[in-house]
Amino acid sequence: QGSHGVRTSYQESFNFSQWGCGTLEGIPTFCSEQMIISPVGLDNEFTALRRLGIDDPFLLLSIDPNCICATPYHMISSQLEELLLGKNPRGTIGTGVGRACRMFHESGDTLTLRAIELTDKTLIRKKLQRQCEYYRAKYDEAVKTSILPEDMAIAEDNLALLADDGYLQYCLELFEAIGKRLKFMDLPEALCQAGTAIVECSHGVLTDAGMGFSPHVSAIRTLPKYTNEMLRTAGYDGRIINLAVHRAYEIRHGAGPMPTYDRNFTEAMLPGSHKDENRWQGIVRAGALDLNLFRYALECCKETPIDGLCLTWFDQIIKNNRIWPICSAYEGKTSIDKNDVDFLKNTACPVIQEHAIPQTSNDFELFRVVKEILRQYIELPLTML
C-alpha cells in the first residue's frame, strides 16, 4: 500500500497503491475488507491513471463496503509518531495505513471511517472531526516536549493541520467526491467473476506484525495463511497457489536490519533514489539478494507453504554489468548495533558470491541460467511467466 512499481511489456511504468498491478492491462481490481483504502490516494491515483489514457479508472475498481479508510489525520499521526522516536527510527511509509489499523483495534467504529460511509456526508464529517480531536489531544503536549529541535518545523506543520478547519473541509469535500464514484461489492460476489483471481498482498512477510523484525513491522498480518483463510471464509473451495514475489536483489526503504546493504550497489541499481528520502521513512537501501532472510520468510509461511517464486526486476541486474550478487550465509557473530548510522546494520559479514549472467538475448536461456543458480541455494519451483 506504499506502492508497487510496474513496467508493462510495452514499457509503460506506474506505481500502484490503490488499484491493482494489472490495471494498465485492463484487469479489474477488487479491494477486500482486509485492504485499508485511502480516499486521498484514490484521488491522486485516479488523476495519474487518467494521464496514462485510462478514461475512467473507477470502472476498473470495486471495493468491499467494510474497508477501513486511512485519512490525512492518520497520515499526520504516522509521521508524528516517527518523529517522536527521535534517533531510534522504526520506519513508516507515512500514509497512515498502520495508524488506521491501530485506531480500529483500539476504538472500533467510533472513530473508524468505513468505505460505505463515504456515501454519507454527515458521517464523514463526524468521524473526521473525531479523529482530528483525538489526535490533537494526543500530540499537542507531546510535540512540545519530545520532538528533536531539527524536527520541530515538520511537527508544527502537522499540528497546524490538526487545528485547521479549512483542511477539515477540504478532506470532507474530497472524501464525498470519492464516495460518489465508488462501486461496492463483497468478496463472495467478487469471486463469482469469470477468470482467475490474483490476490495481491501489500506488505512483505518480514514486516508481518507477529513474525517480522520488531519494531520494524506493519500493524497488519502479511502471511499467506490469512489470505487463504479469507478465501475459504468466503466459500471458495478451489485450488489456491501461493507464490512468493521477490526482487532479484534486496531493497528496503527506511529503518530496519539489512545485512547486505551496499551504497555502491544501491546507486547502481537505483541511481539517485537515495535523494528521495523523507524524515519518517528514511533512505532507500539496496544490496545483494539475501537468501538467509528469504529462507526465514519461507519458514514464517510454513503453515501455508509457498508453491513457487516470482523473481522480479531482473532487468536491473542485466543493466548492472550482468553481475548478480547473492548472499547465502553470514560470517562472524550476528549482532545489532543500535547506534549505527546505517539503521541497525548487522555486524556479521554477509558472504556474497557474484554470478555472471552470460550475454544472451534469449529469455528462455536467461531463465535457465537463473534457475540453475538458485537451485544451488533453495529448493523452490521457479517458473517463467
What do the PLM-derived regions correspond to, one by one?
Residues Q1-L385:
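Non-transmembrane, aqueous-exposed alpha-helical and coiled segments at domain scale
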